[in-house]
């Protein structure tokens, strides 16, 4: 039997457990054990943690309820955006760590002809499309996830990034013409020039902006 004096409690343990508990409450993982293993593995490696910034309600989209939410996609972006491309097994592991259904990952990957590597920014765009249903909604989600503005702010992102995402999603859609995308981008350019090269959802959701799709 051990007495209280013989039990050595690491001084950092209480704070570590406190932060872990807060993270679990914010993230609300479906599989606590799976998520906990991913949390402490990332913590030990000094990698971005699989933790939401705040509690959020699950999002049911027009297409299907994938279980993916803006908060979870933002976690994936923090974890994987430093790589231009990721191996499918790496993406699969991060997806599992967030307790998301594998069949939905496969359905997203099937939207493009990804090979042995997955270009992250393209997967991110498809994830936003899954969240939003329409291209306009997808790009709004992209702005809100990528922006450095505080929550509730204008959600600005570089126009170059917006253009890449828009043209890629238009290509995947297959029914949006080049003249249509050019009309949208040319219309937005005037606003972008006044905003130091940045675009925000208000610009492309305005009635004066041509339809994105």
Per-region residue spans from a language model:
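Phospho-regulatory, low-complexity terminal regions
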Residues: 1-213
């Amino acid at each position: 039997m051990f007495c209280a004096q013989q039990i050595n409690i690491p001084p950092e343990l209480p704070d570590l457990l406190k932060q872990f508990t807060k993270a679990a409450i914010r993230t609300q993982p479906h599989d606590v054990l799976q998520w906990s293993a991913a949390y402490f593995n990332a913590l030990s490696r000094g990698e971005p943690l699989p933790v939401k910034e705040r509690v959020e309600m699950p999002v049911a989209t027009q297409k299907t309820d994938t279980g993916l939410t803006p908060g979870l996609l933002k976690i994936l972006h923090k974890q994987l955006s430093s790589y231009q491309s990721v191996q499918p097994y790496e993406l699969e592991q991060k997806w599992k760590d967030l307790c998301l259904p594998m069949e939905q990952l496969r359905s997203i990957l099937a939207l493009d002809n990804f090979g042995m590597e997955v270009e992250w920014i393209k997967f991110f765009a498809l994830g936003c499309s899954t969240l939003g249903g329409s291209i306009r909604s997808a790009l709004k989600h992209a702005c809100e996830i990528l922006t450095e503005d505080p929550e509730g702010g204008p959600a600005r992102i570089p126009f170059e990034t917006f253009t890449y995402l828009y043209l890629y999603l238009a290509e995947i859609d297959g029914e949006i013409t080049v003249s249509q995308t050019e009309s949208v981008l040319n219309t937005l350019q005037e606003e972008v020039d006044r905003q130091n090269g940045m675009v925000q959802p208000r610009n492309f959701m305005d009635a004066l902006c041509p339809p994105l799709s």
